[in-house]
Amino acid sequence: MKRCFLFAALMTALSTNGQSMDALLKSVEQNNAQLIAYKKAADATKSANHAEVVMDDLELGYNRLWGNPTTIGNRHDISVSQPIDLPTVFGTKSKVAKGKDALADDEYLVRRQDVLLEARLCYVDAVYYNALINELQRRCEHASAMSAMQKKQLEAGDISIIDYNNMRLTLSNTSTALIQAKAERDAVLAQLKVLNGGIDISVTDSIYSPISLPENFDEWFETVCASSPTIALTRDGMTLGRRQLALAQQGWLPKLSLGYMSEKTLGEQYQGVTIGMSLPLWSAGKKVKQAKAEVAAAESIHTAAIEGLKSVLSSEYALTKGLIKAASEIKSTLLSTDNRENLQKSCRAGEMSTLENLVSLTSYYDAVDKMLSSEREAQRAYARLTMYLL
């Protein structure tokens, strides 16, 4: 329930048009072939875990002994016995099985997290290519209009063939960039299709919603630790290790067996209840020592996992913050320095040459490209930063 709440909260704050992202991730989770296989494997593992928490098999015995001399007849023995764990041991075995179930679930959630992150990164890339394609289409339209105007000016003798050819090259380069961007977007959508189990999935968004970074990293990191399947895997590993240690310590307890036995000879028969006990004198000590070592190792792994995750997320947090600032500054500059209409008017009025127009537009276009790229990288960094909340 807690994970569902965190997932819903994350989807509300995501930086890529929430509902569209939410629907995409849900679709991938339902249809991804790897996740379906991992889920089946986890269920099979849990079934195997509980198959071990049963009573030992019933033991049946039959003896036929020939008498010597023959006058004493033969002896027939029949025995049935059932080994029985003490209730304490049986309860601990059940807890160990449940601990293994938790690990199987954690391993599935780690794989789920990786698949959903891959899908989310593809979504970020698709939005970037949509925005880039829209921008390149506008540039093609502008270059096409300028080329048509330059052709008329060339025919009128107002410009040289060099100016006209420069504009044609600009149009050709822009058209090529547009074709390349569409091909790269198709590749991203093809990858999304694979992640979605072979089902087509479309992405129409071309604008990112603003990223809202947590103000207090340490407090936010505590939330991540509480919900991260990677940390849960090591935490549940510690819990399982402690339960296995308790089971090993209970290995010193005797094991009982109850049964029935019948002995039949010539003219005589004995039958009744049998009670047995096995004493673990030799193996229990080594098992306890091994279990203690495994608990210590699990605790070290858990501590290292938390420290490693904090280091990674701290780096991603700083990177995301820097990329957001860079994209914001470029966007602010572009809004205050957009001279495209003025450049087009000046060129038509003959106030500036085609070369001057192209140089000015190229500077502006380079800034737009950097802005789109910075936004994309910021979104990708944010996706990696929040992947543990998926």
Provide a role label for each language-model segment:
Residues 58-95, 204-214, 256-292:
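Small/polar, glycine/serine/threonine/aspartate-rich low-complexity segments that form flexible
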Residues 26, 30-36, 43-57, 79-96, ...:
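A glycine-/polar-enriched beta->alpha junction
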Residues 37-49, 111, 115-138, 145, ...:
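Amphipathic alpha-helical coiled-coil segments
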Residues 16-59, 84, 92, 158-159, ...:
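Bacterial Sec-pathway N-terminal export signals of envelope proteins
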Residues 1-24, 29, 390:
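Bacterial Sec-dependent N-terminal signal peptides
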Residues 98, 161-170, 292, 354-362:
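Short, charged, amphipathic alpha-helical segments
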Residues 114-227, 316, 323, 342, ...:
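Periplasmic alpha-helical coiled-coil/stalk elements that build and connect Gram-negative outer-membrane
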